[in-house]
């Protein structure tokens, strides 16, 4: 990669992108991270918190810590890991909840394999960056949950969404944002 481009990208990452989330999105009152900020920079402190956002924050700051070695990135990653395990992880049935309310209480308890996959990515990267055995243990647990509850041997594939107790959902409606994601990924060849 061109050295100038690499330096510009690293500067953008370390002076704008990573600090943005550290300064604006940490929920000091209820734990974890705020679930929403508008395009006009209006924070929505009572917005629901999603597993995917938390897991992406975990992966991002874990990777940033691994590559750049800054302690504040490790602290952000650890905050995301703790919140994922303490609030999103379903200690009774395994997997992670799709969403929590702003206070960190389960809201939508269905098991979305997409969200569990992101949790595995984040926890695995945290383990890679820090050697943390707890992160690895939960990543393996979540992987095993997918294999034991989502794999359909008859169809040789995986069920995307299940109830909290890992039962099939007969009819699943997607939100507008979920439909947009599905359209983007199917149209882009992902």
Q: Model regions: which residues?
A:
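Glycan-recognition and catalytic cores of secretory/periplasmic carbohydrate-active enzymes
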Residues: 1-190
């Amino acid at each position: 990669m061109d050295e100038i481009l690499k330096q510009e990208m690293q500067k953008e990452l370390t002076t704008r992108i990573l600090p943005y989330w550290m300064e604006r999105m940490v929920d000091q009152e209820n734990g974890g991270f705020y679930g929403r900020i508008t395009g006009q920079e209006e924070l929505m402190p009572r917005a629901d918190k999603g597993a995917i956002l938390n897991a992406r924050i975990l992966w991002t700051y874990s990777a940033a810590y691994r590559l750049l070695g800054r302690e504040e990135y490790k602290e952000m990653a650890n905050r995301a890991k703790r919140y994922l395990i303490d609030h999103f992880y379903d200690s009774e049935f395994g997997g992670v909840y799709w969403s929590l309310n702003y206070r960190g209480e389960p809201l939508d308890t269905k098991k979305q394999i997409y969200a569990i996959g992101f949790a595995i990515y984040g926890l695995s990267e945290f383990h890679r960056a820090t050697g943390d055995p707890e992160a690895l243990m939960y990543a393996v647990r979540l992987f095993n949950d997918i294999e034991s509850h989502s794999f359909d041997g008859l169809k040789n594939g995986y069920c995307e969404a299940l109830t909290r107790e890992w039962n099939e959902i007969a009819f699943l409606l997607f939100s507008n944002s979920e439909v947009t994601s599905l359209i983007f990924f199917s149209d882009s060849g992902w």
